[in-house]
């Protein structure tokens, strides 16, 4: 009898262990095939492990200056990743040797690693207590080694460096300022509060920029790197002088597009210097820009966090695609990013109920703007009327592993704030005004033009980034969650009283936000 009972317990434990292991594997992974699958293996030891912990840690860290939080959080993240890798490295290397996995890439913004893995290896990893989940990596790209730029690209970048080294037009409040900059309150901030974004670095993940002085003079330069085809600062990247392209894996940060330059328009709204005629598009005209290419690349988040970015402005977003559990991985990363001192912002999207690309309620604002700590910015015209394309909330997180906290009965209120997405000059490729009959060129400058006409909430997001830069130049130690709170508290209410699904907390008020920022300890 004892023998039969022991056997029953043994079988039950095996079954239980198998069930628990399979529960760690993303349901989107097909384990019936024997081919390699792109996966991200999330370790159990995280600074933020599940929903609710970010808010708790924000409260605990609120008494610390942002610089201290950045230092401490990066150290924690790196330490956890290093310790976890030491424990699993032997197993991972053995699986590489026997053909079970390949193309390993380690990360610390979320403690884990990506690889191509066969089902047998996936099942083996799932049995380990130090692994919490195995995601289908829906954003996996072939791994490329850092390589020097092509000859033409190097020549173009040397021209950028040459222009950057020349003295730029000094910022002056007497320059011609577009209506959107004035009406968001930025010009009043410069004149009345003497806050211009000085000392603040904004990372922009986009398409890169046109080679034109007004944008080049806004760039932040990596003082430890030379433009020589080498990795001078020892960070594993070649020629990351003004940022990095994490898709091509090189330092070429110019826009390769031939018709329109999305990145140039966004950078110009945040930090564009004066044109040759004195037209200045920037909200934070003394802030500096770090250029990055490669949305949904965790290494780009690690790079900007460890290289001193205070804010990250993003235009990329995914809607109308089932991302499954991978949403939780990116929420994890952005919560770590925020805890470590970087405010993430971006446009809420152009999928509103009256848009030609309209999406259903609850699906108009996608990853990463649907993440609670990422500010999603909606759009109104100069008359404060909602633009037809502007995406509306709410957002849901029900069923997302570790982060299933916002259901349809308890939804996440989005967008967060509102700004202006069109009707003012933006930097673009010369000749781009010919794309649409209602676009017009207002000025030509070296290598580029200022064009009125391009529209989209991708241009609302940079307004929030620029205003946040003004706030941080007035009070550099504000933490991201404190900056977000002030922006919401000082916004001009629109639509229904209080926060709503069309305008969030309302239209951003730069002057009120900067004054409130100065009063925070």
Task: List each model region and its residues.
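Substrate-binding/access-modulating region of protease and related hydrolase catalytic domains
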Residues: 197-198, 273-277, 290-374, 383-384, ...
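Inhibitory N-terminal propeptides of secreted protease zymogens
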Residues: 22-155
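Bacterial N-terminal signal peptides
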Residues: 6-17
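Subtilisin-like serine protease catalytic core
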Residues: 30-34, 177, 188-296, 307, ...
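Active-site-proximal beta-strand/loop segments in catalytic clefts of secreted hydrolases
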Residues: 43-45, 117, 137, 204-208, ...
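Protease zymogen maturation seam
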Residues: 127-201, 211-215, 386-393
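Extracellular S/T/G-rich loop segment that most often corresponds to the catalytic His/Ser-adjacent loop
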Residues: 206, 235, 366-469
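C-terminal subdomain of the subtilisin-like protease fold in secreted/lumenal serine endopeptidases
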Residues: 178, 280, 311-313, 450-451, ...
């Amino acid at each position: 009898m004892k023998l039969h009972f022991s056997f029953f317990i043994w079988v039950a434990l095996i079954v239980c262990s198998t069930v628990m292991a399979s529960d760690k594997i993303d349901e989107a992974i097909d384990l019936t095939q024997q081919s390699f699958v792109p996966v991200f293996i999330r370790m159990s030891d995280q600074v933020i492990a599940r929903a609710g912990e970010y808010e708790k840690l924000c409260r605990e860290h609120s008494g610390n200056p942002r610089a201290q939080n950045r230092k401490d959080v990066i150290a924690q993240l790196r330490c956890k990743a290093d310790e976890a890798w030491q424990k699993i490295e032997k197993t991972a290397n053995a699986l590489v040797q026997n053909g079970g996995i390949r193309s390993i890439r380690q990360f610390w913004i979320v403690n884990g690693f990506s690889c191509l893995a066969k089902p047998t290896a996936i099942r083996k990893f799932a049995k380990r207590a130090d692994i919490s989940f195995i995601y289908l990596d829906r954003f996996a790209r072939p791994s490329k080694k850092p390589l020097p730029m092509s000859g033409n690209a190097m020549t173009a970048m040397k021209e950028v460096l040459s222009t950057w080294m020349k003295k730029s037009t000094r910022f002056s409040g007497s320059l011609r300022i577009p209506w959107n900059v004035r009406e968001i309150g930025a010009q009043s901030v410069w004149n009345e509060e003497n806050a211009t974004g000085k000392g603040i670095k904004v990372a922009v993940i986009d398409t890169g920029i046109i080679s034109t002085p007004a944008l080049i003079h806004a760039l932040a330069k990596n003082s430890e790197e030379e433009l020589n085809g080498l990795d001078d600062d020892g960070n594993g990247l070649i020629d990351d002088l003004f940022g990095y392209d994490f898709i091509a894996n090189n330092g070429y940060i110019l826009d390769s597009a031939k018709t329109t330059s999305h990145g140039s328009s966004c950078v110009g709204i945040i930090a564009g210097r004066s044109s040759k005629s004195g037209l200045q598009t920037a909200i934070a005209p003394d802030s500096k820009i770090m250029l990055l290419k490669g949305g949904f690349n965790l290494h780009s988040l690690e790079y900007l966090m460890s290289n001193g970015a205070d804010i990250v402005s993003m235009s990329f977003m995914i809607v109308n695609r089932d991302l499954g559990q991978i949403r939780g991985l990116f929420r994890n990363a952005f919560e770590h990013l925020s805890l470590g001192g970087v405010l993430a912002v971006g446009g809420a999207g152009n999928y509103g109920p009256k848009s030609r690309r309209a999406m259903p309620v609850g699906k108009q604002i996608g990853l990463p703007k649907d993440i609670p700590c990422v500010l999603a910015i909606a759009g109104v015209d100069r008359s404060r009327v909602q633009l037809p394309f502007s995406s509306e909330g709410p957002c849901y997180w029900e069923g997302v592993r570790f982060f299933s906290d916002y259901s349809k009965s308890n939804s996440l209120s989005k967008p967060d704030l509102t700004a202006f997405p069109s009707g003012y000059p933006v930097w673009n490729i010369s000749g781009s005004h010919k794309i649409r009959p209602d676009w017009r060129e207002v000025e030509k400058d070296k290598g580029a033009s200022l064009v009125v006409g391009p529209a989209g909430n991708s241009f609302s997001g940079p307004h929030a980034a620029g205003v946040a830069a003004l706030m941080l130049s007035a009070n550099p130690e504000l933490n991201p969650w404190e900056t977000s709170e002030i922006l919401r508290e000082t916004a001009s209410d629109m639509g229904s009283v209080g926060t709503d699904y069309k305008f969030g907390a309302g239209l951003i008020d730069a002057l009120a936000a900067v004054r409130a920022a100065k009063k925070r300890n």
